[in-house]
């Protein structure tokens, strides 16, 4: 919600300049891509833990993933994660492609800044490979 409000205000209040004739929106998007939806959910649990730790006043390095992490959370914690991770997608290539396309359409962003906060380096590289393979590009 806050992102969409910021984009609306930016576009409404934009004043052309020598550097930029029209509004140009860049939006950050978290992607947790893997070969299966289950693996992607597992990988995403590192970021989920990290965000909750930060909210609890206990910041630190990105923790390792935990199987079925969200099953241990309260309804309030799940609501916090839904809000914080509303600019993200997780899943296999088809799921990620759809999530990126939906976010790009919803925001009308001219450019996406994609990140993949995955604990394991090789899994993070695989996530970025999948992101590159799905190749969402604005026409």
Label for each model-derived stretch:
Residues 104-139:
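Generic C-terminus detector
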Residues 1, 90, 118, 122:
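Charge-dense, low-complexity intrinsically disordered segments
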